[in-house]
């Protein structure tokens, strides 16, 4: 094989692969493909400098990474607003004058979003959605997904977005194989797809038989007027497409399409959890714009939750960071939307009483999307005498101490109870609290079991020697974790207070304490707490009791952490002491405006009433602005806001 033969062979192999994997119309036998493929492999071994970036041999798995790098998306990957009923669909269409719009409808596959970047026709990178702006670099894994072209017939820079999925059949085969190897089953196809994308060994990724279905583009220089035209073009480049993609006009047609897709839900080889509806006209979509979270021109009309019948075998007891004992139902196992469900939440023992639930009952189990499965009903007529009463516990299942029964809640009051300690550490390190990246549930459990950490303060005593002998902890992983811990040592005071896990004291309450009392937060009185807006006696007493019991532990923690105090000298202006509602799309995020207004001493509310002083509005303000006008509330746009502050 010479260079010209090699170039032709690569083109042929890519063409045959597309015909086989994408078009489901083979152009060559397996034997013919394998012979040509092996010839290409041999040529590339002998001529490594001539190897093409889009050679099919680049799909060979086996590369193992230490970690994933981060990649910034050129265009943000937005989340979608969810709706669940025809009435919500009508309301969505009525917002922004979408009544006469043409819509593009397609299945919402239940998988993991992926952003592919192509330049000069070559696949440059692949990244997960991440936080919408920055994702993880999974390029090596994307290259072994057969339905991701390594090269496309389009030279300009373009981001192609889509969903990585696993078929129901392939998912079942994966779990059969895992069972043979005494490995735990994967939870569901969606988690399997997401988890596969994040495998450091792309040999495993190749075995999982992932598929990529595009649903949109990010950065591009295309000249089309409609989203449907963009998708036709993308699919012409060699990507998969589903046969249910429709251009629709009017609410009635959308309802018909939704019912049609719902009727074939179980027949589809891939899990779907709804129908995506978007405004087809790109100029109209651009005009509609975005909220802080979602595009206003598209929505996911979710399918109803799936209900199944199962048998309740037993009740497990979990103990949380505040000591609350939560009952969890153990089922005989039922398959719902590709997920094998064995555990269901029961919230508290009052819920068990409300359902009149007994062990060994047949029950109705419901699961919708990411919602934790729960029991919604009991088939009392099917009781056969084998049922038994569920007894309220009196002893903590984790530490053996006596429980306090408060009615709705049953609590373990032992502050050194293992379950409470571990849950507290996990909560403290979580993303919404101190955001210690890499210190997740499993690692906290492991470090606690090995007696490496026994309380929150021990997190800050960790060093390289702490991880000696622990499986899976390589130098880079340890370095990243210690760096994340070090970066958490100067949080805002409100974030630190919220991270302590004080019952009834969340982000909002913690912010009020920090903003009003600053460095006096450890020595507040009941009267001072009750003086705060929104603080009731239960919140105030909970805070004071936590400080009384845990003061020494908090002081120990403050030897490592230096919370940043908020500036208590508030800048006063026209907004000080006023109630403000923010609505519409502004030049900055709503959270930024909210923080700024609160720094002036304003209260930011989510709804307009007679007590509202100002409504700060942006584009597509909607009903809140209308209500402000009806009530005579002063409405100001962003430019007026800037002049007043």
From Swiss-Prot:
UniProt xrefs under Pfam families: BRCT, DNA_ligase_aden, DNA_ligase_OB, HHH_2
UniProt keywords, alphabetically: DNA damage, DNA repair, DNA replication, Ligase, Magnesium, Manganese, Metal-binding, NAD, Zinc
Catalytic residues (UniProt): 108 (n6-amp-lysine intermediate)
Gene name of the record: ligA
This protein's GO CC annotations: cytosol
Xref: SUPFAM superfamilies: BRCT domain, DNA ligase/mRNA capping enzyme, catalytic domain, Nucleic acid-binding proteins, RuvA domain 2-like
Primary enzyme class: ligase
Binding-site residues for NAD(+), renumbered to this chain: 30-34, 79-80, 106, 129, 163, 302
A biological process term (GO) from this entry: DNA repair
PROSITE patterns xref list: BRCT (PS50172), DNA_LIGASE_N1 (PS01055)
Names of required cofactors: Mg(2+); Mn(2+)
UniProt GO MF annotations: DNA ligase (NAD+) activity; metal ion binding
Family of the protein in this entry: Belongs to the NAD-dependent DNA ligase family. LigA subfamily.
Protein name per UniProt: DNA ligase
UniProt entry tagged with the keyword DNA repair: yes
Matches recorded under HAMAP family: DNA_ligase_A
EC number: 6.5.1.2
Residue ranges of every copy of the BRCT domain listed in the record: 570-645
Function (record text): DNA ligase that catalyzes the formation of phosphodiester linkages between 5'-phosphoryl and 3'-hydroxyl groups in double-stranded DNA using NAD as a coenzyme and as the energy source for the reaction. It is essential for DNA replication and repair of damaged DNA.
Reaction(s) the record says it catalyses: NAD(+) + (deoxyribonucleotide)n-3'-hydroxyl + 5'-phospho-(deoxyribonucleotide)m = (deoxyribonucleotide)n+m + AMP + beta-nicotinamide D-nucleotide
Keyword Electron transport among UniProt keywords: no
UniProt binding sites for Zn(2+): 396, 399, 412, 417
Source superkingdom: Bacteria
